[in-house]
Swiss-Prot record:
GO terms for molecular function: polysaccharide binding. SUPFAM superfamilies: C-type lectin-like, PR-1-like. InterPro entries: C-type_lectin-like, C-type_lectin-like/link_sf, C-type_lectin_CS, CAP_dom, CAP_sf, CRISP-related, CTDL_fold, EGF-like_dom. Residues 52-182 form the SCP domain. Disulfide bonds join C236-C249, C251-C260, C327-C432, C408-C424. Keywords: Disulfide bond, EGF-like domain, Endoplasmic reticulum, Endosome, Glycoprotein, Golgi apparatus, Lectin, Secreted, Signal. It is found in: Secreted; Endoplasmic reticulum; Golgi apparatus; Endosome. This is C-type lectin domain family 18 member C. GO terms for cellular component: endoplasmic reticulum; endosome; extracellular space; Golgi apparatus.
Length: 446
């Protein structure tokens, strides 16, 4: 089994050789160095795992401790690049001269050694040993020493790693090329001086929002910043599945709610069941929570008639879902505004209410009015209460602005009754709508 440690004698010999060879292998090995047939394949899975684990372990051992050190993940594409560069055996190529490698924003650690002198694990360990000659406080390497392997290996913002190895020949000698590629690259310079590779501080104390998790294996000295296993900071109940991209629970049949915490056994007598909300959409002429109540159309309570539809404006305030239920009990739905005409007429009418005594509830929240539009995280779009997609829109400037927290839509008085997404628990007045098809099928006195 390979270990990063080497015997004292062999380690000293390797250190001397590395110091002699340096990092710019094209300057050490002559142009007549010839490429040999590739080794039998690239690094195998076990070798890749060993190198990745070693890199992360060494990154957790830096002193002083790193506050922003990222955990490295293996990249097959970087491994292919590293394998291709190892196969060059140190020979300059037009692509290298043109800066192709630099445009890829890839950082490199490279070494040529006599074949069989060292394993890849030992080479990486010796790169890390360069850190003994590096001063983090001064941000520089000791005089006449090389530390660039070390600084790239522990560059905090590098998050992807891939390595390759190739056997070359130089006359009678067999030479082994070791290459590791890192992305994003490190060893950036300012005014000719390489900046420090990481910020010192308590482990994981300066992780960015996208990598706010803290990874620490059993053999790590400190933690490494990583994409959190559960960035949503939530879990789904009753065998629901969490989509960490949308922070939405996909519930099994029979359950609903944000966390699949609500058992839904509702039966719709005269209507269709909406599983995502555990509610019924009633057939024409029926109302109530289960669409079991026969209702009569109350012509005398229409506040507005627009293209045959009846709109009723409530005088009391309630939360969005209670308001929707109250409309349904009457055989209607929360208003669905599907054209500029309806929007303009409702805005004009509600604006007049502001100057009359028709607002009987003094609650400050009742200046706004619920309509039947909500944001559905599962569909990543706003939908009407009947499930239809929202085509027409009249959101106020800067709205909608808080998906996931303000999922219900109101007509906002301060924005000339254009739309605003709001917390569903807010108490607003509301507008019920009875479609023309409802009215024609019920008929007067039915």
């Amino acid at each position: 089994m390979l270990h990063p440690e080497t015997s004292p004698g062999r380690g000293h010999l390797l250190a001397v050789l590395l110091a002699l060879l340096g990092t710019a292998w094209a300057e050490v090995w002559p142009p007549q160095l010839q490429e040999q047939a590739p080794m039998a394949g690239a690094l195998n899975r076990k070798e890749s795992f060993l190198l990745l684990s070693l890199h992360n372990r060494l990154r957790s051992w830096v002193q002083p401790p790193a506050a922003d050190m990222r955990r490295l993940d293996w990249s097959d594409s970087l491994a292919q690049l590293a394998q291709a560069r190892a196969a060059l055996c140190g020979i300059p190529t037009p692509s290298l001269a043109s800066g192709l490698w630099r445009t890829l924003q890839v950082g490199w650690n490279m070494q040529l050694l006599p074949a069989g002198l060292a394993s890849f694990v030992e080479v990486v360990s010796l790169w890390f040993a360069e850190g003994q000659r590096y001063s983090h406080a001064a941000g520089e390497c000791a005089r006449n020493a090389t530390c660039t392997h070390y600084t790239q290996l522990v560059w905090a913002t590098s998050s992807q790693l891939g390595c390759g190895r190739h056997l070359c020949s130089a006359g009678q000698a067999a030479i082994e090329a070791f290459v590791c590629a890192y992305s994003p690259r490190g060893n950036w310079e300012v005014n000719g001086k390489t900046i420090v590779p990481y910020k010192k501080g308590a482990w994981c104390s300066l992780c960015t929002a996208s990598v706010s998790g803290c990874f620490k294996a059993w053999d790590h000295a400190g933690g490494l910043c990583e994409v959190p296993r559960n960035p949503c900071r939530m879990s789904c109940q009753n065998h629901g599945r969490l989509n960490i991209s949308t922070c939405h629970c996909h519930c099994p049949p029979g359950y609903t709610g944000r966390y699949c915490q609500v058992r839904c056994s509702l039966q719709c007598v005269h209507g269709r069941f909406r599983e995502e909300e555990c509610s019924c959409v009633c057939d024409i002429g029926y109302g109530g929570a289960q669409c079991a109540t026969k209702v009569h159309f109350p012509f005398h309570t229409c506040d507005l008639r627009i293209d045959g539809d009846c709109f009723m404006v409530s005088s009391e305030a309630d939360t969005y879902y209670r308001a929707r239920m109250k409309c349904q009990r009457k055989g209607g739905v929360l208003a669905q505004i599907k054209s500029q005409k309806v929007q303009d007429i409702l805005a004009f009418y509600l604006g007049r209410l502001e100057t009359t005594n028709e607002v009987i509830d003094s609650d400050f929240e009742t200046r706004n009015f619920w309509i039947g539009l909500t944001y559905k995280t599962a569909k990543d779009s706003f939908r009407w209460a009947t499930g239809e997609h929202q085509a027409f829109t009249s959101f106020a400037f800067g709205q909608p602005d808080n998906h996931g927290f303000g999922n219900c839509v109101e007509l906002q008085a301060s924005a000339a009754f254009n739309w605003n997404n709001q917390r569903c628990k807010t108490r607003n007045r509301y507008i019920c709508q009875f479609a023309q098809e409802h009215i024609s099928r019920w008929g007067p006195g039915s």
